[in-house]
Amino acid sequence: MAAAAVSRTLLPVAGRRLWGFTRRLPLRAAAAQPLYFGGDRLRSTQAAPQVVLNVPETQVTCLENGLRVASENSGISTCTVGLWIDAGSRYENEKNNGTAHFLEHMAFKGTKKRSQLDLELEIENMGAHLNAYTSREQTVYYAKAFSKDLPRAVEILADIIQNSTLGEAEIERERGVILREMQEVETNLQEVVFDYLHATAYQNTALGRTILGPTENIKSISRKDLVDYITTHYKGPRIVLAAAGGVCHNELLELAKFHFGDSLCAHKGDVPALPPCKFTGSEIRVRDDKMPLAHLAVAIEAVGWTHPDTICLMVANTLIGNWDRSFGGGMNLSSKLAQLTCHGNLCHSFQSFNTSYTDTGLWGLYMVCEQATVADMLHAVQKEWMRLCTAVSESEVARAKNLLKTNMLLQLDGSTPICEDIGRQMLCYNRRIPIPELEARIDAVDAEMVREVCTKYIYGKSPAIAALGPIERLPDFNQICSNMRWTRD
């Protein structure tokens, strides 16, 4: 890991420059000859290959029960602290699908120490924020607070995941809340299309199920289901206590030992295995000619977090880029697909994505088109994918690498995104990858590597397709698959 840097300031001596080039000072003497200082004398000040980086160190400690404590101290007056748990909808089956998300909702409904009102008042009085979310492979509970309130924030998080009452009345009341949330999700067409995409790409597997679960499960999940899920999955080796901002690692470590050291024991017997999820090239079409626009997602199988091809696929994803009609630039856009789309008025917007899981992933593109341009837009996408496999240039790759590094650094703006990055990376890699290492891995990608990796994962592969809306003109699946091997002019 990158060591914490010591900031050094070098004060210049009057009349001298600290760069290794010549300084020219004109004299007002009669000869008016220039006098030179410097030359090779300051060559020793040139930068060394290894530079001192002002990057806070991510400190990691593992407790005896397997729980990992990770933190980054930036010295500010606020902090974010949270619990990242290796448990999501992928660990569910058909009968209890939706339990992880239901449990997230129940976390703030009261504990053995605090009623729901007491919990809300305590958070409000601290000026803090308490939140949670569930994904297909992770469940997260986190709090944002003043640095001085770190002990209280950790105690509240520990109370939530270990002492929730899970009262029957609260469970029944929360069913209606989740059902209304499901109705809201169904109005978000992008969410709907991505659920369809997972359903067709990972048919009859855990990744093919939704995070919220089907309606019948939401109506039938019991307190026993929630308790069983906690007992099975909320174990020390599968939990990371992460913090960022103004936090002292030793203080956080002592808090973790006090609140979690004796309670979150390791698994007794076998650790629940992550169910394998096989990718299937296939499609889901939901035609509705009453809708004004067609929503379409097309993806190929990618790789998991730790696969060596992950970085190269991220660069390829950046090469495709994003676009919508509000963008300026026209034919001067860096993305070739954006240029084609803008020039031909092929769609309202498109967004490339690279979704990674533990052992698999989805790499593709989501687009919103008018009925008349669906086929042309899909053809343009596949043509651009084939170009990635055969003709991408070094200048394009260099530009994409710079953009990828910039976007990654801009996302780490504030204690909350940094804390999320720490927690996620600890679960995925069992370490926090230092930024210089990540930049070096991105810099190692070249055009030849992009062509090889894209050929490996894109060329000749059957994609997964989810389409919704007026999609009458969408080509049939066999034609789409054939265009993954060659393109017509």
Curated annotation (Swiss-Prot):
Cofactor dependence: Zn(2+)
GO cellular component terms given for this protein: mitochondrial processing peptidase complex; mitochondrion
InterPro entries recorded: Metalloenz_LuxS/M16 (IPR011249), MPP/UQCRC_Complex (IPR050361), Pept_M16_N (IPR011765), Pept_M16_Zn_BS (IPR001431), Peptidase_M16_C (IPR007863)
EC primary class: hydrolase
UniProtKB keywords: Hydrolase, Metal-binding, Metalloprotease, Mitochondrion, Protease, Transit peptide, Zinc
Compartments it resides in: Mitochondrion matrix
Catalytic activity: Release of N-terminal transit peptides from precursor proteins imported into the mitochondrion, typically with Arg in position P2
Residues of the site described as Required for the specific determination of the substrate cleavage site: E191, D195
Residues annotated to bind Zn(2+): H101, H105, E181
Transit peptide (first-last residue): 1-45
Pfam family, one: Peptidase_M16_C
EC number: 3.4.24.64
GO terms for biological process, alphabetical: protein processing; protein processing involved in protein targeting to mitochondrion
Main location class: mitochondrion
GO molecular function, one term: endopeptidase activity
Note on cofactor: Binds 1 zinc ion per subunit.
Location of the active site: E104
Activity regulation, per record: Binding to PMPCA is required for catalytic activity.
Effect in UniProt of substituting D195A: Severe loss of cleavage site specificity following an arginine at position P2. The loss is complete
Quaternary data: Heterodimer of PMPCA (alpha) and PMPCB (beta) subunits, forming the mitochondrial processing protease (MPP) in which PMPCA is involved in substrate recognition and binding and PMPCB is the catalytic subunit.
Family: Belongs to the peptidase M16 family.
Functional summary from the UniProt entry: Catalytic subunit of the essential mitochondrial processing protease (MPP), which cleaves the mitochondrial sequence off newly imported precursors proteins. Preferentially, cleaves after an arginine at position P2. Required for PINK1 turnover by coupling PINK1 mitochondrial import and cleavage, which results in subsequent PINK1 proteolysis.
Protein name: Mitochondrial-processing peptidase subunit beta
Taxon lineage: Eukaryota, Metazoa, Chordata, Craniata, Vertebrata
